């Protein structure tokens, strides 16, 4: 149990630090669609795609790796709550077009990046 908790905590801390760094570096570039949050969600979608495919192909890997990468790192990196708050803020400001653009880009982009991650792993294992 303690190993699982430690794996999740280490992964979550690393993911959250990367999310903070992306926001710090990117959000001022285009505030109406904060690119740091978008980058975190797209990168996280890609990483989780690779991880899901990798763990499916390598069931002999310790479950601690899955907890570290998927539950911890991707959970700490991706940020649905921040995305939701940013969209609601845009809606409250009457910025409907940027709000709906953010929804479309985050959701479709994350799904596409997850599929790209799975495809990347399948390509790499050949």
Curated annotation (Swiss-Prot):
Transmembrane segments: 4-24, 36-56, 68-88, 99-119
Known regulation of activity: Na(+) is not transported, but it plays an essential structural role and its presence is essential for fluoride channel function.
Catalysed reaction equations from the record: fluoride(in) = fluoride(out)
GO biological process, one term: cellular detoxification of fluoride
Cellular compartment(s): Cell inner membrane
GO molecular function: fluoride channel activity; metal ion binding
InterPro entries: FluC (IPR003691)
Keyword Cell inner membrane: yes
Membrane topology: Multi-pass membrane protein
Pfam family, one: CRCB
Binding residue positions for Na(+): 75, 78
Chief location of this protein within or outside the cell: membrane
Free-text function comment from the UniProt entry: Fluoride-specific ion channel. Important for reducing fluoride concentration in the cell, thus reducing its toxicity.
Similarity comment text for this entry: Belongs to the fluoride channel Fluc/FEX (TC 1.A.43) family.
HAMAP family cross-referenced by the UniProt entry: FluC
NCBIfam families for this protein: crcB, PRK14196.1
Name this protein carries in UniProt: Fluoride-specific ion channel FluC
Organism (species): Chromobacterium violaceum (strain ATCC 12472 / DSM 30191 / JCM 1249 / CCUG 213 / NBRC 12614 / NCIMB 9131 / NCTC 9757 / MK)
Gene: fluC
């Amino acid at each position: 149990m303690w190993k699982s908790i430690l794996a999740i905590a280490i992964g979550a801390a690393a993911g959250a630090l990367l999310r903070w760094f992306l926001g710090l570096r990117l959000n001022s570039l285009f505030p109406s669609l904060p690119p740091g949050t978008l980058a975190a969600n797209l990168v996280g979608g890609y990483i989780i795609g690779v991880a899901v495919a990798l763990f499916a192909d390598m069931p002999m890997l310790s479950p601690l790796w899955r907890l570290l990468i998927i539950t911890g790192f991707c959970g700490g990196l991706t940020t649905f709550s921040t995305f939701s708050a940013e969209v609601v803020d845009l809606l409250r400001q009457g910025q409907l077009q940027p709000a709906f653009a953010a929804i479309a880009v985050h959701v479709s982009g994350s799904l596409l990046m997850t599929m790209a991650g799975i495809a990347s792993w399948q390509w790499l294992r050949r």
